Amino acid sequence: MKRFFGVLFLLFLMACSNNDNLKNCNFLLNLGVNVSVNLNLPQYSQLQFTSNSVYIANQGNGGIIVINVGTGLRAWDAADPNHTPSICSIMEIDGVNAICGCTDANEYSLFTGGSINVQLACGLKEYRVTSSGNNTYIISN
């Protein structure tokens, strides 16, 4: 009986795995984020329409990019997850995409967070967006 439980325990340990997708995605810090976005305010009013996005500075690693994807809002860290933090690794909004300012100009979809044209190790770091009513959303992690 002890052998049975010993073998069962070993099988259980071998079945556990880590998340290999995030193994090389260690450039961005896991900083606390808690931002209120009221779509009735002028600086966020364009988020009432699909495909529009805004940049919120001084949050996360490089600011936050928020986009209306048609079914709600999605929020991404504006720092390129495939670069060490630097001035050039802060992305700029280009329509429905975000482009890194470094020489390789990594480009990501703001709808999915995935890279465009080139397979990269890491996608954009996403933050949780929850509705708190009255056209107000909370962005947090």
Question: Where in this protein do the model-derived segments appear?
Answer:
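N-terminal pre-ligand scaffold of iron-sulfur
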Residues: 20-95, 106-110, 125-141
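Compact Cys/His-rich metal-coordination microdomains
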Residues: 98-100
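Acidic, glycine-rich flexible loop segments
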Residues: 115-117
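Sec-dependent signal peptide recognition
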Residues: 2-9
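C-terminal motif of bacterial Sec signal peptides marking the signal peptidase cleavage site
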Residues: 12-15
